[in-house]
Amino acid sequence: METHRKNSVVGNILHTCHPCRRTIPYRIYAIFHTCGIIALMYHHVHSLVTANNTLITCLLLLSDIVLAFMWATTTSLRLNPVHRTECPEKYAAKPEDFPKLDVFICTADPYKEPPMMVVNTALSVMAYEYPSDKISVYVSDDGGSSLTFFALIEAAKFSKQWLPFCKKNNVQDRSPEVYFSSESHSRSDEAENLKMMYEDMKSRVEHVVESGKVETAFITCDQFRGVFDLWTDKFSRHDHPTIIQVLQNSETDMDNTRKYIMPNLIYVSREKSKVSPHHFKAGALNTLLRVSGVMTNSPIILTLDCDMYSNDPATLVRALCYLTDPEIKSGLGYVQFPQKFLGISKNDIYACENKRLFIINMVGFDGLMGPTHVGTGCFFNRRAFYGPPYMLILPEINELKPYRIADKSIKAQDVLSLAHNVAGCIYEYNTNWGSKIGFRYGSLVEDYYTGFMLHCEGWRSVFCNPKKAAFYGDSPKCLVDLVGQQIRWAVGLFEMSFSKYSPITYGIKSLDLLMGLGYCNSPFKPFWSIPLTVYGLLPQLALISGVSVFPKASDPWFWLYIILFFGAYAQDLSDFLLEGGTYRKWWNDQRMLMIKGLSSFFFGFIEFILKTLNLSTPKFNVTSKANDDDEQRKRYEQEIFDFGTSSSMFLPLTTVAIVNLLAFVWGLYGILFCGGELYLELMLVSFAVVNCLPIYGAMVLRKDDGKLSKRTCFLAGNLHVGSYCVKLLRPQVTSPLRLIHNNNTSGWFKRKKHNMNESV
């Protein structure tokens, strides 16, 4: 049933919501698939009772339990998916009635996150089609870099030309880099002059970054000349004082024609000390929450990664269609836009779109209590950070109350003094910050964890996915960078899974069953490494040994495996296609799940165990957004896998690839020339081999820098050969694979053994 929401003031329909057409078929299929899973569990239990060796059966049972659970978490998001539509053109309000907006942009490393990228993101939101005096942009520089500070000073000067140009000419691409690199940008004298100004600014910033320091000759603003003296020899990214600088003030700054008011632009680098925990990105966001609370305290907050520029100047008004709706705004915590990326290869070879996480699952969540928070592109209700909708948790000082009206100048001395105080590294001691107030601590995936806790407190959220992307970002172009990013996510997800606020316990208790199961999908996703490892090695070794671990083709249970496998993959493919994907992208996405399971998830689990045992400390490694390697970029555009430098991360993956290839050759030979019924094993091995084709090419055929290293291939080969040699050295011990039960031995293996005895 379609629902409409109206703005009670002007009576316009601002947004609609309607269920997806696939809901009923998915619900029917869920019943049949559930029955199939129950039958499979019965088969496993029966095999466990009758088997001579329980280890193999237990491993297969464990793997199928994980697969069944992950299917249940996905299915919970398929039972009530909805799509929404907004009407921003119908939003009507006087300029003075528009709510204020605070924008939080986070960066941490000027070399992995180039300052010009930060500049373009900041300029794109400063130029929103919105009253400029209502916008305040806060840039958190967690690396405390003078290079980033210099770039933002340059951005403030350029904005006085850029913002009037955008609004006067109704420019849609309000990131200067995107606008000037497009073929459709204006060729007028004004535009060409502005392009020259931008290129000059870009040249200065990149020169400073390349040299690693800000030379005095480049500092043209006397107002900020003394600020650079703060970067002394003792200043480091892990130990430095608070720096807060107002680079642009809406109360006093106007464009060069004196017609347009400029938005606020504030640089924030919080105090850091090696003896005080800083809680990574969550700590930086909480610092911005307090600093902005003291200075502007806008009721709406937009969080952005430094590479996620605004692609639509009307995005803010789209969010207001929900955030100002009197019927839902009191319980609405945030409006989440999907992450979308520019520069993705034609078939998204690394599955960087993350369509399942950012689109498919979000549509499912939206039919329950609302989407998860994904770390960027999210408009928050400031009140949501201060306790449940029904109970306001007061902060420690009155200046941080969410409903306070900030009526003092942001450059007032007492305001700046208090802002420096709340950005101190010991300010949060003995407060509710990170536990009951603000972004939550306890996981490296602070975004997902915070969204989960807000939902548990009773807040709802909305997924806004307009046809024109609201934001565009950058994605890894090298498999090493992607795997490194996923390891960090895996550790954070494990932290969430095993905490006292685990979605499977606290989530299901605090939320309804479907929402709780849906929230289990991502935190338990690293457990995919269990079935991927078991099914990547066990049936293959069985096939090489001529032993069956699956039902034969003549066994009725054979068809249960076929139906469950093809049914699950067909539903996954339909999800992808119905949300605008393609078959090739889906294929790459499911292949990347295998790669992540045997690399990121595998090593993420090891790192989590070491961290739990206090044998290592958590690390927040910034994913590089700098794409300076032309050869690497060329390989990505040609959709050639780039395994980068020699890395142990790919050792399990390479080992599995080698085992599957040998099993495929041996199994195919056995079936073609000796007969037999190991069809399920051979089907699984064939599926794995096709998925591993890029790995085989990187091992043998390629000579470029993106190939798999000889060391990794050598170690992987030795692992397989070593395991085989152990078997040969112990002929008197029956292989565990042959003890599954006697009548599981394949026909072709028996015939082969019989022929050998006759020849003797």
From Swiss-Prot:
Active site residues per record: D142, D447
Keywords: Cell wall biogenesis/degradation, Glycosyltransferase, Golgi apparatus, Membrane, Transferase, Transmembrane, Transmembrane helix
MF terms (GO), sorted A to Z: cellulose synthase (UDP-forming) activity
Record has Oxidoreductase as a keyword: no
GO BP term, example: cellulose biosynthetic process
Entry EC no(s): 2.4.1.-
Places the protein is found: Golgi apparatus membrane
Cleaved signal peptide residues: none
Superkingdom in the source lineage: Eukaryota
GO annotations of cellular component type: Golgi membrane
Keyword Secreted: no
Bilayer topology term: Multi-pass membrane protein
Main location class: Golgi
Transmembrane region(s): 28-48, 54-74, 530-550, 558-578, 593-613, 656-676, 680-700
Cross-referenced Pfam families: Cellulose_synt
Tissue note: Expressed in young seedlings, primarily in the vascular tissue.
Family (UniProt): Belongs to the glycosyltransferase 2 family. Plant cellulose synthase-like G subfamily.
Function: Thought to be a Golgi-localized beta-glycan synthase that polymerize the backbones of noncellulosic polysaccharides (hemicelluloses) of plant cell wall.
Protein name: Cellulose synthase-like protein G1
Organism: Arabidopsis thaliana
Gene name as annotated: CSLG1
